[in-house]
Structure formats: C-alpha cells, structure tokens
C-alpha cells in the first residue's frame, strides 16, 4: 500500500506525514508493504 511496490516515494512521504516518523520504505518479498521508521 501507499505507493508500494512501484512508488517508494509515496510511501516515504506518507510516513513522513505521521507524527514521530522520519519516513518510510517498501519492505517484504515483493516490496508491497509500506514500512514507516
């Protein structure tokens, strides 16, 4: 979700908008999960 697996930037900006998170990346076998950090 959130742009994954094709648009990692969308995932990153989604996570950046959540308080306490710096950004995000696509994880999983097929990079289909947006993981915030």
From Swiss-Prot:
The keyword Secreted applies. Gene3D superfamilies: Knottin, scorpion toxin-like. It holds the Pfam family Defensin_2. InterPro entries: Defensin_invertebrate/fungal, Scorpion_toxin-like_sf. Its main location: secreted. It comes from the Eukaryota. Disulfide bonds join 4-26, 11-34, 15-36. Keywords: Antibiotic, Antimicrobial, Defensin, Disulfide bond, Immunity, Innate immunity, Secreted. Coiled coil: none annotated. The keyword DNA damage does not apply. It is found in: Secreted. GO terms for cellular component: extracellular region. One of its GO terms (biological process) is defense response to bacterium. Two peptides derived from the C-terminal region have been synthesized. The peptide Os consist of residues 16-37, while the peptide Os-C is an analog in which the three cysteine residues are omitted. Both peptides show potent bactericidal activity, and high antioxidant activity. Belongs to the invertebrate defensin family. Antibacterial peptide mostly active against Gram-positive bacteria (MIC=0.24 ug/ml on Bacillus subtilis, and MIC=0.94 ug/ml on Micrococcus luteus, MIC>120 ug/ml on both Escherichia coli and Pseudomonas aeruginosa). This is Tick defensin 2. The lineage of its organism: Eukaryota, Metazoa, Ecdysozoa, Arthropoda, Chelicerata.
């Amino acid at each position: 979700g959130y742009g994954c697996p094709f648009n990692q930037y969308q995932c990153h900006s989604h996570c950046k908008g959540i308080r306490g998170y710096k950004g995000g990346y696509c994880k999983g076998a097929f990079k289909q999960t947006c993981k915030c950090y």
